[in-house]
Each structure stands twice: as structure tokens, then as C-alpha cells.
Amino acid sequence: MAQVMDFKVADLSLAEAGRHQIRLAEYEMPGLMQLRKEFADEQPLKGARIAGSIHMTVQTAVLIETLTALGAEVRWASCNIFSTQDEAAAAIVVGSGTVEEPAGVPVFAWKGESLEEYWWCINQIFSWGDELPNMILDDGGDATMAVIRGREYEQAGLVPPAEANDSDEYIAFLGMLREVLAAEPGKWGKIAEAVKGVTEETTTGVHRLYHFAEEGVLPFPAMNVNDAVTKSKFDNKYGTRHSLIDGINRATDMLMGGKNVLVCGYGDVGKGCAEAFDGQGARVKVTEADPINALQALMDGYSVVTVDEAIEDADIVITATGNKDIISFEQMLKMKDHALLGNIGHFDNEIDMHSLLHRDDVTRTTIKPQVDEFTFSTGRSIIVLSEGRLLNLGNATGHPSFVMSNSFADQTIAQIELFQNEGQYENEVYRLPKVLDEKVARIHVEALGGQLTELTKEQAEYIGVDVAGPFKPEHYRY
């Protein structure tokens, strides 16, 4: 166990309110609740010490308590400075104890962290006293990056200085590593050796994992949870379809019907965005670099354009690419007066927030938390949500519980798979086995009252599958 019950959250007095919300979410998260029942006696995560970094929401609270119910010890931070629901964080810290004597899980997260505080929190999930974490559960790859780059700079004996074009966040990251190197030399190398595996939640984090693997610096096996079908085709699309509109409504009360909307990117998240706006009666255009995705958008009835072509007429612009430099400062200058700009990709670098926040000829007016008006020297202004970070979590509470039950059941199963099968996986990136993906889907089909058709032995043999599945080959595209 960690030496002390340490934590840092906004307000422990919010714990009771958080507990009520967690109980409600449990009814909408059948995947996690089923896993608790199935593995209660087996305790497959007994001995696991999980460093967790996922948005500290009510749904994540159900995930955390599922991991601990299966035997794990956990320390937790959020993966975004704005996404924490403070009542959920408080409830997890208090656990079965009281506000005066909390007895839950150490959480280091609160809504509205500074960048320096954010990286301090990430460091805390790796600080286990006399022990070391042996599993990582990540969203966006920041926790994994801390271990890999931290070890690299330890070996070099120096954390490099920030460069002129480095983001404020990366500068804060280097500052954290510099402090740790001075105070705890060798920390990251020890952690890299102790960790049995990492499970990664998002597209952005998965890209980082593949990059680390190509570099030859991935020190442990990684499970790509994002590309599990029950994650990418449900969380990314259906979750976004719900939470994007929720975020915009809470932020602005803007009517979307009849508005010109530009969605940048038509992957699974972009598809959810376009469908959401279409359902509200907006006129949707899409930007896309991939010709296959672009063709899908056209066949779905959307115009495919470039940013430069469509930015001047757009009332709402949403980035959903997982890439960087999608909306430049020059393009923002061309936007309609009081047009809305937001991002639903993992990081804030899809929009040139650096220019908005640091240029002398731009004036910032905070309308309310995570809603800012930026006025240009021309007199025109735009409304930016969550400082260019995930608006569905900064301006709302993220995806609904049921869809997160899919994703977090995948995470739990992936943690069990890597933890129990040490030595069977190389230091590479793996997909969640199809049989486990189908298991998660089956639980949720039953929860929604669906009735699955059972193949006869002859039918199964005819298409070359087992009667119980898996029903599709790994390469099948759903």
C-alpha cells in the first residue's frame, strides 16, 4: 500500500453529492457491474498497482471502484485540466470513510488546474512510497509519456530546455521532469522496469504508443483499447453525438438549427459531430484529408470543403481530427463576428490557442467558466469553448454512462489481460482480442433487451466460425 492516504481534490464536502451520482451511473453501466459480479471471487487484479489518468468524471468513478473491487490498488489523476467533476473526485477519495477520515482512493484532480498543477498531479499517481506502480491506465498518453521521456532524460542526465515553439503545456511537462530528476533521480527508470503494461483509451494516445514503439523506446506492452470496436464505434461516435450538443448548449444556449457548421475531421468522432449537428437541423460541411473518409462524408450527405473555403460563412466550427494546427490565427480572423469555435479532439493544439492567449492585439473576456470571447483588432470577436480543449468535458460532463460502460469494460478487461499474462506480450502495441470485444458487446445487448440469434452448428461451419464466436475476423471493418 502507499504509505499514506494522500490526495488533492477541490472539496471533500462534495462527496455525498458525488456518491448519489455514482449510484445513478452504476445503473447505466452494466458492463462494469457485470465484471464486478463475474470476478468478485477471483480477484484478477490483486497485486496490481494502477497509475490511472483518465478524465475524473462520475463514470470514471465507477471504473475506479470496479478496479478496486477486482483487487487493484489505484492512484488517479485526470488527463485534462478542465474535465474533472469535483463531486466525483471527492466521493472516490472519501470512499467508505468520512469527510473527516477518508478511506477511498488517492485522487489528484480538480476542475480548472493550471498546467503546472496538472503535471504535478500526473507525477503523484506514480508516487507510491516504498512501492512502485506496475500498471498504467491512460487516456491521451500523458502518463505513459512521462515515464518514457522521464527515463530518457534520466539516462541523459539532463532534461532539455524548452524551445521557442514549444507549447505552454510541454514547457510545464519539462518543468515537472526537471523537478523530479533533481528530487528523485532514477524514479522513471524504476517505474519503467516495474510496469507490466499500459492500456490506452484514445486515438491520440494510441498514436503516441505506436510512435514510441517505432522509436524502440516502449518499455512495456501496450493494449490499444481505443480501437476495440466496442470503444471506437460507440464511445467515439455515439458518445460524441450526445455530449457535443450537451457541451454547446450548456456553454451558449445557442440554437443550432439553420446554422452553418464546419466539422473538421470525419473519423469516428467527426462522424458523431456531423450527425449531432444534422439532427439539430444545422447545415453541415466537413473537412477531411483522407479520401476514404471524405467519400463517406459525401455519401452521408455532407459537403466536403477546405477550412479556407468554408471558415468565413461558418457560425460554428468544431475540430475533431486528433491532429495539430487545424485552425490558424489567420483563419480565425476571417470568422464571422461572434462565431463559435470549439474542439473535441484530445489536445488543445488543433486550434492556435497560443496566439489567442499571448498576442497583444487580442483581448480576452471571460463570459463564464470555459467560455471566452476573444476580440481582434478589427473589432470582430469569436467565442472559444474550454480554451480549445475537449468542450464536451470542459463545458459539460462528457459522454453518457451507458456508452462509457462499453469503453471502461474494455479498459478493465485489458488491464486484467496484461496483468495476468506477463511475459506473453512483447513491448509492442496490441489490440483487444476479438473474443473480449464481443463479450463486452454481448453484455450491453442484453442490457438493452436485445435478443441475439444463435447460429446452428451447420451455419457456423458454413462461414468458418465457432457457434459462440468470435464471429468476425480481426480485419473486419464494422
UniProtKB/Swiss-Prot annotation:
Chief site of localization: cytoplasm
Pfam families: AdoHcyase, AdoHcyase_NAD
A GO MF label: adenosylhomocysteinase activity
EC number: 3.13.2.1
Gene3D superfamilies, sorted: Adenosylhomocysteinase-like, NAD(P)-binding Rossmann-like Domain
Pathway(s) per entry: Amino-acid biosynthesis; L-homocysteine biosynthesis; L-homocysteine from S-adenosyl-L-homocysteine: step 1/1
InterPro entries per record: Adenosylhomocyst_ase-like_sf, Adenosylhomocysteinase-like, Ado_hCys_hydrolase_NAD-bd, NAD(P)-bd_dom_sf, S-Ado-L-homoCys_hydrolase_CS
Annotated positions binding substrate: 57, 139, 201, 231, 235
TM ranges: none
Entry keyword set: Cytoplasm, Hydrolase, NAD, One-carbon metabolism
Reactions mediated catalytically: S-adenosyl-L-homocysteine + H2O = L-homocysteine + adenosine
Cofactor: NAD(+)
Biological processes per GO annotation: L-homocysteine biosynthetic process; one-carbon metabolic process; S-adenosylmethionine cycle
Cell location: Cytoplasm
GO CC annotation: cytosol
Note describing how the cofactor binds: Binds 1 NAD(+) per subunit.
Amino-acid positions noted as binding NAD(+) in the UniProt annotation, renumbered to this chain: 202-204, 236, 265-270, 288, 323, 344-346, 392
Family: Belongs to the adenosylhomocysteinase family.
UniProt function note: May play a key role in the regulation of the intracellular concentration of adenosylhomocysteine.
Protein name in UniProt: Adenosylhomocysteinase
